[in-house]
Every structure is written in structure tokens, then in C-alpha cells.
């Protein structure tokens, strides 16, 4: 019985051995065929290529990187950027060679053993090797996107019939440098290929200064003022200017400018001439005289200051000489203020020799809107950087601190009318106003100052004249309204 079963057992064992050999042989053949493919778990440039051959892997990489566009979002707009637009190129040969090298480094029988036991090898990742043209990408972003989708800001526009401007609108501009970095990152990823383009808000510029000039003349027209308005404005940031003489829809030349009675505004040149001659801080009496002359508009303090600091006999002429040296040829003071003061000289200027227009200016004191405005500019420039015309013409005779003291005195002239009435409460205004009545009749009114605002500082000098009579209320309101329009020009609302 035992002798009959033993051969059967041997045959069964032999069969099992042969079967095992056959299975192993089949697995070996199968594994050998897989040897031409990349191992399971391998990635090239984040693209899974495990079990794929070289050609199929290359196709997968091309589909992921070279065929699939990058989706660019410009606000609500969607733009598809093909990698070729940036000359993006995969170095397939280098990446596949690196993958081949990694595969060949694994021992055959170790791999076969892992294959038999279905063990997954440690994942292998081959990094991306690619290049693109930064200049081509920049050109694409500039020409195809920025030029097409950027929105320029819209400047504020005058609101006809008012002193206001319609708010300007911000624009948008593509940040190209930052966009290049973001698109570069997206081009190098097979899955994160959406880019929200970085946009910068661009603030609208101020309207052209010509728009302000038109508005100021419209204000005169709407007020139905039938006299003459002389105005000088200087943007202290840009140097842009407005200078006009305007009456009943007609523009008069400002070369030379129009001569007006300067009245108390001539006290600004007096103060400048006094400070030119002060070698140190003024004593208490000089300080009192300057303050009463500027802040209280005292005439006697003006005379006493000239006699004390400038010259007891020729003070007015010395003030005039200083102004002419500064190039202000239409500004003069021909005598002191006290009643009956002698006329020390008869001045003829390009402004008062005009025959086309005549404001009947006082023979004792005259200026023009541009002359006094430019003098205010000179003082301002001296305070800012210790430079400007004052220091150029009179070197070592003015200091930055002295110029600031002059501004401080003018800033304490708190009238609350004219230029000051046109700006918000608390706005610093360094100014001097002036008018004269003859037998109870006022013909000329003026105000000149520096206005300090969040949107920029400026000089504004306004003179108005009427041959018959200026009525205070409409005349002062006209100056205030032009001042308000100017403030609004420099301080725009943006939406």
C-alpha cells in the first residue's frame, strides 16, 4: 500500500515544482518586459510615468506642459497663454535620461523580488528641466494684455457752473514684473496653471491747469462782474502757472502784467527788505512793528519799521530798489503811508505805461498779480530748502529761518475772508490783503498768499478793480469763490 502511494506523491511534488518554475518563469518574463518601462511610483516633473515607456512618458510631459495653456485672469477677463508664446521648452532628453539612469541603478533581482511580492519601490521624482524666454513673456504681457486690458485713470473734470470737479476715476495697470514671476511658476507646474494677474490701481492726475483757468473765468462770468480781474497762480510742486487779466469775456495781455494799487499788500515787500538788513534775530521792538504791520495791517508800524531798519529817509525807495533787483519791475513804494507823506519819486513801469487798460493805480504804491505772486514764491522756496531767487540775488542776506519767520507772520493774518474764505477751516494760509477807499469808495481789492493743502501747496494772487466802485460783499465773495475753485483743483476726490 505504502509502495503504491509514494510514486504518486513524487509525481504531485514534481508537478508542483514544475508549476512553480513555470509561474516564476512567466513572472520573470513579465518583469523583464516591464524593464523597458519606468518603475512604479516614478514621476518626471510631477507627472506620473510609472509603468510607461519612454515615448509615452514624453507624450505625457508634452501634454502637461507644452500643450496645456496657462489660464491668466485679468479681473473678470480670462486669457489663455500658450507656453509657446513665452518660448517655453521642455528638455525631454535630459529628464528621460535622468529617469533611465535612476531605473538602471536598481539591481535586477532586487527589483524582481519586489515585483513578485508586489512591493512598491520608494517613489522617485525627476525634477523639471525647462526654459522660457523672459523677454518674450514680458513682450506678450505688455502688448497682448496690458495694452488691451489696462484702464487709464480718468482725471477729474470741471462741473460746469460750480466751483467743483467731478471725481476722477482710478485706472488699473498690470504689474508686469510680478506677473512674469507668477507665470513662470505656473509654466513649471502641471496642475497649478491658473494665475491671477497682479493689478495696480493708478490714481487719476489733476486736470490740466488750463481747465482751472477756464473755470476761474467762468466764475467771473457767472458772477456778472463787469470790472477787471487780475490773477496769478503758481503750483509750487510743478511750477505750472496761470496768469490772466480778464474783463467781461475779454482776455488782456499779461506781458507786461496789469498795474494795480497794492495798498497794504506792499507791506510784504517792506517785510522782505527789512529782513534783508537784519543780521540777527530782530529785537522786541522790531518784532512788534513787523507783527503790527502784517497781522494788524498797521500803516504807522510800516513807516516806523522802514525808518528803524531800512533807512529813515529813503526807506520806500530802498524797498523799491530791492524789488527791482529781484526782477519785480512793476512793484514800487514811492512814499510812506502817513497822510501828506511826500512823493519821493514818480515811477514809470511797463505795467503802468500800458494804454490798453488802466486801473488808475495809486502813484504811491503799485504791483501786479504776478509780481507779488512771484515774491511769495521766492519766500516759500527759501523756507523749503534754503534756496530760490531771494538767496540767489541776495546771498548771505537771508536765512531759511528768516524766511520761515516771514511766512509765520503772514500766517497769523487771520482774516477769515477773501482767499481764506475759500478754503476749509484749519487750512494754513500765509497771506496779505489790501484795499483803499477814497472818499468812501473802493475801486481795488487784492489778496496774495501761499495756501498749504494736502493735495499740494500753491501761491494765489488776486486783484479786482472796478472803475466806478467795488461793493464789498460781491467783490470779496468773488475772490473767495475763485479761491475755493483753486483749492478744489488741488484736492480732488477720487472714486
Locate each region found by the language model.
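Surface-exposed, secretory/extracytoplasmic low-complexity segments enriched in Ser/Thr/Asn/Gly/Pro
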Residues: 1-246, 251-254
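Second-shell loop/turn segments in exported
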Residues: 42-50, 121-131, 165-174, 202-207, ...
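Extracytoplasmic/secreted proteins, especially bacterial periplasmic and envelope-associated proteins
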Residues: 56, 60, 136-140, 178, ...
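Sec-exported extracytoplasmic/periplasmic mature domains
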Residues: 62-66, 104, 142-146, 184, ...
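Active-site-adjacent helix/loop patches that line small-molecule binding or acyl-intermediate pockets
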Residues: 211, 226-230, 285-373, 377-381, ...
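Structured C-terminal helix/loop/strand segments within mature extracytoplasmic catalytic/sensor domains
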Residues: 223, 364-367, 373-495
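Active-site-proximal beta-strand/loop segments in catalytic clefts of secreted hydrolases
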Residues: 234-237, 245-247, 274, 294-297, ...
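Active-site SXXK
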Residues: 239, 258-281, 293, 460
